Amino acid sequence: MKTTKKIAVITGANRGLGKGIAEELSNTNNITVIGTSTSQKGCKIINKYLKNNGIGIKLDITNPNEITKTMDFVYKNFGRVDILINNAGIIRDKLLINMKTQDWNSVLNVNLNSIFYMSKSVIRNMIKNKQGKIITIGSVIAHIGNCGQTNYSAAKLGLVGFHKSLALELAPKGITVNMIAPGLIKTGMTNNLSQKQLSKYLSKIPMKRLGTIKEISKITLFLISNDANYITGQVIHVNGGMYMP
């Protein structure tokens, strides 16, 4: 199964942004995509759209031992990992006064700790090959805050410091480390918003529209290309002007 194509691991590839990014990469025909999901149902979805351009693998990204076993399988069957895209994430929204410890811990574990586990699982191989791309999907919420999302914003902003430090560690090895921070993107979740809710969100976006999954996947494609070899330690904001650093 080893191939001359680049090997990309994408977490949470069964729906939303992860699915869109995985499809974009697989359509280049020079990237084999390994998409992860927490369920067998999700893996079937991944296998269906990837066809011969990759596979879906069931993986709990909060379990270091499971990650080790999965990555051993990847290295044995594909030889290496050239690209890691940390996309999977969850929300457990509540005002802090009502937030349970479990709500806090679960979001920090999936949205922050798992990125440590996944990144650590690939960097030794990338260092050996003297090249690699690590990209993590962040959020505009990390930079502007949002009521009911202290856990989510803390995790996503924590990733910024993590990636800047990791970028410094890996830059001499030829490995780039970057983040994409989307604003409000049109997904299944936003399709369920009422017109009143949608209008409220759009009032905060100067471009007066939602972003698209395609726009995020195209930026991801650029960041993993050789055209972005001199870009590292950056957060690329894609939010229609909602936040301007």
Swiss-Prot record:
Binding-site positions, substrate: S139
Keyword rRNA-binding: no
Source organism, top-level taxon: Bacteria
Residue positions binding Ca(2+) 2: N146
Annotated pathway: Lipid metabolism; fatty acid biosynthesis
Keyword field: Calcium, Fatty acid biosynthesis, Fatty acid metabolism, Lipid biosynthesis, Lipid metabolism, Metal-binding, NADP, Oxidoreductase
Entry binding sites for Ca(2+) 1: K51, G54
Residues involved in Ca(2+) 3 binding: Q234, V235
Gene Ontology MF term list: 3-oxoacyl-[acyl-carrier-protein] reductase (NADPH) activity; metal ion binding
Entry EC number(s): 1.1.1.100
Residues that, per the record, bind NADP(+): G12, A13, N14, R15, T38, D60, I61, N87, Y152, S153, A154, A155, K156, I185
Active-site residues (renumbered): Y152
GO BP terms: fatty acid biosynthetic process
InterPro entries registered for this protein in UniProt: NAD(P)-bd_dom_sf, Sc_DH/Rdtase_CS, SDR, SDR_fam
EC primary class: oxidoreductase
Extra remark: Calcium ions stabilize the structure, and may inhibit FabG activity by obstructing access to the active site.
Family that this chain belongs to: Belongs to the short-chain dehydrogenases/reductases (SDR) family.
Subunit (UniProt): Homotetramer.
Function: Catalyzes the NADPH-dependent reduction of beta-ketoacyl-ACP substrates to beta-hydroxyacyl-ACP products, the first reductive step in the elongation cycle of fatty acid biosynthesis.
Protein name per the record: 3-oxoacyl-[acyl-carrier-protein] reductase FabG
Organism for this UniProt entry: Buchnera aphidicola subsp. Baizongia pistaciae (strain Bp)
Lineage: Bacteria, Pseudomonadati, Pseudomonadota, Gammaproteobacteria, Enterobacterales
